[in-house]
C-alpha cells in the first residue's frame, strides 16, 4: 500500500459570519482562491496531473450547491479533465475529504489529490432548509439534533462546571491571539480579499474572529444559550460562527519524490466512528482510540493534539475521556481553537490538520493527532507523522 504524504496545507483567514470580512465574497471564490494558491505555491506540480479534488461542505445549497467542488475548480481554471466531488460528513467533512483522497492514493487509484473544504455560514446558515424526519424522535432524542443541548448533556455527565468552560474559552482566545501576534499562523494563512467595516476592499491575512478583549468576568456574565434554566453552555463557550476555506495537497510518497517535492508529513492512520447522537461531542474519544490502534501507537506517543473545539464542555469532556486534562496546556490546541477562530463546518477538518502540521514542525514533534466531533453522533481522527 502506498504511503500518503502531505505536501502543502493552507487556509483562508477566518471571517466573522455576521457582517464580517467575507460578507461580499462567495464560498466558491474562497475555495477557488485556495485551489489556485496551492497550485502556484508548488511549481513542480502540473495541475492536469491531479487525479481528483475532494472538497468538504455541509450546507450544499444556494452558492454552495450543485457540487461546489467542481464549481470552484472551474473558477480556479484547473484543467477540465480534473474531476471534483463535494464531501459531507457534517463537521468532519474536510477531514473526510482528506481520508477519501488519501484512501484513493493508498489503493493505487490515484497519485495526487487536492483536498479541502469550505463553509460560508454567513451566506448559508447551518440550519438553512433542514427538515428532520418527524419519525426520528422514535429512535433518537429530539434534542440530539441541537448541538448546544448535546454539549449540555456532556457537561452534566462529566461534571464540567461553568467556570471550567469559561476558563477554557478564555484560553482559546488568549492562545489564538498570542499565536497571531507571534506570526505563528502566517505560514498557513493565504491572504484573501474581503471588505472592512466600511465596505472597502481589503486584503486580509489575519483571523477576524478572535476576540483578544475576552475576559473571565465577561464570560461569566453571559446567559446560558441553549438551556436557559439549568444550562452552563453560553455563546462565549461555543465555537464562533465564521466563514472560511482550507486546502491540502496530498500525494503518494513515490510521486512526491519523482516531482522533487518535499513532503511535510505522512498520514499514519485514519478512523471514523459512531456514537450516541445525544452526546455527539464525545465522538473524538473513540475515534482517537481507534486511530491510535491502527497506527500502532499509544496516547503517550502523540506530541500534539488538535481538537475541533465545538464547545468548551464538549472539549473538556473529550480531554477527560482521553486522559489529557493534565497535559492540555502542553499538547492540546496550543494556538487556540474554534471557540476563538470559528468553526466553518466544511472547512474545519483540513483547517485543524493544517494548524497541527505547522505546530508539529515548530515544536519538532514526530506524531500529531487531529480529531473532531460530528453532529448526530460521529467522530473522526487522523494521525500524522512528521517527515
From Swiss-Prot:
Its EC number is 2.3.1.16. It is an enzyme of class 2 (transferase). GO terms for biological process: fatty acid beta-oxidation; phenylacetate catabolic process. Keywords: Acyltransferase, Cytoplasm, Fatty acid metabolism, Lipid degradation, Lipid metabolism, Transferase. GO terms for cellular component: cytoplasm. Pathway: Lipid metabolism; fatty acid beta-oxidation. The keyword Protein biosynthesis does not apply. It is found in: Cytoplasm. Its main location: cytoplasm. It comes from the Bacteria. The active site is at 91 (acyl-thioester intermediate), 343 (proton acceptor), 373 (proton acceptor). One of its GO terms (molecular function) is acetyl-CoA C-acyltransferase activity. It catalyses: an acyl-CoA + acetyl-CoA = a 3-oxoacyl-CoA + CoA. Belongs to the thiolase-like superfamily. Thiolase family. Heterotetramer of two alpha chains (FadB) and two beta chains (FadA). Catalyzes the final step of fatty acid oxidation in which acetyl-CoA is released and the CoA ester of a fatty acid two carbons shorter is formed. Involved in the aerobic and anaerobic degradation of long-chain fatty acids. This is 3-ketoacyl-CoA thiolase.
Amino acid at each position: 500500500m502506498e504511503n500518503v504524504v502531505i505536501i502543502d496545507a493552507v487556509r483562508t483567514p477566518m471571517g466573522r459570519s455576521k457582517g464580517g470580512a467575507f460578507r461580499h465574497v462567495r464560498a466558491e471564490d474562497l475555495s477557488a482562491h485556495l485551489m489556485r494558491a496551492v497550485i502556484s505555491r508548488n511549481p513542480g506540480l502540473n495541475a492536469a496531473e491531479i487525479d481528483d479534488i475532494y472538497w468538504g461542505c455541509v450546507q450544499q445549497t444556494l452558492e454552495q450547491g450543485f457540487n461546489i467542488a467542481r464549481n470552484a475548480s472551474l473558477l480556479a481554471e484547473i484543467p477540465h479533465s480534473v474531476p471534483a466531488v463535494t464531501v459531507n460528513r457534517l463537521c468532519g467533512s474536510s477531514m473526510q475529504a482528506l481520508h477519501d483522497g488519501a484512501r484513493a492514493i493508498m489503493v493505487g487509484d490515484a497519485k495526487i489529490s487536492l483536498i479541502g473544504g469550505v463553509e460560508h455560514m454567513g451566506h448559508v446558515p447551518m440550519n438553512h432548509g433542514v427538515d428532520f424526519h418527524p419519525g426520528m424522535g422514535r429512535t433518537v432524542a429530539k434534542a440530539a439534533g441541537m448541538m448546544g443541548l448535546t454539549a449540555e448533556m456532556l457537561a452534566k455527565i462529566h461534571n464540567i462546571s461553568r467556570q471550567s468552560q469559561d476558563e477554557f474559552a478564555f484560553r482559546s482566545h488568549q492562545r489564538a491571539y498570542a499565536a497571531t501576534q507571534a506570526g505563528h499562523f502566517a505560514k498557513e494563512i493565504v491572504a484573501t480579499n474581503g471588505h472592512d467595516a466600511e465596505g472597502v476592499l481589503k486584503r486580509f491575512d489575519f483571523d477576524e474572529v478572535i476576540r483578544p478583549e475576552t475576559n473571565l468576568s465577561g464570560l461569566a456574565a453571559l446567559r446560558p444559550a441553549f438551556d436557559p434554566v439549568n444550562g452552563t453552555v453560553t455563546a462565549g463557550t461555543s465555537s464562533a460562527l465564521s466563514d472560511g476555506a482550507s486546502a491540502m495537497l496530498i500525494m503518494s510518497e513515490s510521486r512526491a519524490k519523482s516531482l522533487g517535492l518535499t513532503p511535510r508529513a505522512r498520514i499514519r492512520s485514519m478512523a471514523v466512528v459512531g456514537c450516541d447522537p445525544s452526546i455527539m461531542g464525545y465522538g473524538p474519544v473513540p475515534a482517537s482510540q481507534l486511530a491510535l490502534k491502527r497506527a500502532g501507537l499509544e496516547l503517550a506517543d502523540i506530541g500534539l493534539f488538535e481538537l475541533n473545539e465545538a464547545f468548551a464542555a464538549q472539549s473538556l469532556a473529550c480531554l477527560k475521556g482521553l486522559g489529557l486534562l493534565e497535559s492540555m496546556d502542553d499538547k492540546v490546541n496550543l494556538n487556540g481553537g474554534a471557540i476563538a477562530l470559528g468553526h466553518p463546518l466544511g472547512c474545519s477538518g483540513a483547517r485543524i490538520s493544517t494548524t497541527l502540521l505547522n505546530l508539529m514542525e515548530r515544536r519538532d514533534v514526530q506524531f500529531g493527532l487531529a480529531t473532531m466531533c460530528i453532529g448526530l453522533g460521529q467522530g473522526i481522527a487522523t494521525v500524522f507523522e512528521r517527515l
